[in-house]
């Protein structure tokens, strides 16, 4: 990616190096909880990556609920300040990519209000409860912020064999896609539909939410430009994103973790669906094409 010399977003918080504790973390039965323990048991700690994002997004709005999860807490939460552990290279990638999404979506949507990205290590306070790195990157609609533990990118490269700067940019753009859905009321509508749906139907709704976010990521990638007007992506970059989308498909992860594929349990889409959604956005370059 052509990141050198590009402007950085100021909508960025560096909480890396802080020691945080949340007493409302894992609990049970609360309607605001996500299905994090269930997903962990299926895919393993540190192996959830983008899968949990959909759970957290919808359930922080009071969606599916479940056996427990990251819950809002009225008990004290604390953070001890420490020296940042964020490398200059990763910080620049995060802020430049975020800045370019602001540039594109600001023009495409007109009244776009940028999200803020928070980099943290281990765990951090959010308006959706206490966020933990095991959940992978996530978007909290209550504070309209994206949360990323930078160690996730090492996991993406090593465990899922999806290295590269655009693989990382795809993750960021996917979360920005959830922010757009929130601004446009799509998450609220999905939540309302889930409240009337069966578990299987609710999963299908969630898949459509995630595929749309993938498509939005592709739309941004197609339109991303440097300050000089060149495409931000270089040769081979888009393929990095496609490899990442393939690696985190529900069917691929289920095969790896449990040896069988259960389509009714999909919450983010198969590898083929995720790749097709990213490709649709990239090929059309048009947000209107991202209807699922």
Task: Enumerate the predicted regions with their spans.
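Long amphipathic alpha-helical segments used for membrane anchoring, targeting, substrate engagement
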Residues: 1-81
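Post-HExxH zinc-binding segment in Zn-dependent metallohydrolases
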Residues: 1-22, 199-228
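Short helix/loop segments within enzyme catalytic domains
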Residues: 88, 92-117, 204, 208-253
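Active-site recognition of the HExxH zinc-binding catalytic motif
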Residues: 105, 148, 167-183, 213-214, ...
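Catalytic zinc-binding patch centered on the HExxH motif and its immediate surroundings
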Residues: 123-149
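Short pre-active-site segment immediately N-terminal to the catalytic Zn-binding motif
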Residues: 152-170, 201-207
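Catalytic Zn2+-binding segment of zinc metalloproteases
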Residues: 176-191, 225
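Pan-zinc metallopeptidase signature
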Residues: 248-292
């Amino acid at each position: 990616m052509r990141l050198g010399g590009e402007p950085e977003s100021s909508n960025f918080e560096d909480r890396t190096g802080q020691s945080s504790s949340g007493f409302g973390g894992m609990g049970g039965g609360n309607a605001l909880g996500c299905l994090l323990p269930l997903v962990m048991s299926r895919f393993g700690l540190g192996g959830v990556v983008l899968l949990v994002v959909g759970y957290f997004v919808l359930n922080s709005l009071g969606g599916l609920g479940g056996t427990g999860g990251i819950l809002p807490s009225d008990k004290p939460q604390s953070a001890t300040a420490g020296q940042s552990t964020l490398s200059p290279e990763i910080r620049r990638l995060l802020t430049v990519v975020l800045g370019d999404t602001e540039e594109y979506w600001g023009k495409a949507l007109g009244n776009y209000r940028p999200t803020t990205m928070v980099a943290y290590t281990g765990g951090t306070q959010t308006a959706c409860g206490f966020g933990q790195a095991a959940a992978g990157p996530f978007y909290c609609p209550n504070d309209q912020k994206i949360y990323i533990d930078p160690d996730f990118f090492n996991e993406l490269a090593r465990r899922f064999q999806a290295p590269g700067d655009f693989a990382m940019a795809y993750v960021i753009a996917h979360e920005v896609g959830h922010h757009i859905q929130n601004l446009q009321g799509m998450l609220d509508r999905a939540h309302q539909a889930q409240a009337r749906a069966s578990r299987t139907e609710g999963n299908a709704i969630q898949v459509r939410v995630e595929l749309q976010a993938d498509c939005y990521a592709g739309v941004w990638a197609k339109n991303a430009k440097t300050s000089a007007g060149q495409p931000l992506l270089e040769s081979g970059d888009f393929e990095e994103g496609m490899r990442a989308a393939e690696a985190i498909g529900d069917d691929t992860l289920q095969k790896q973790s449990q040896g069988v594929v259960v389509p009714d349990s999909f919450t983010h889409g198969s590898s083929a669906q995720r790749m097709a959604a990213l490709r649709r956005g990239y090929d059309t370059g048009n947000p209107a094409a991202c209807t699922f």
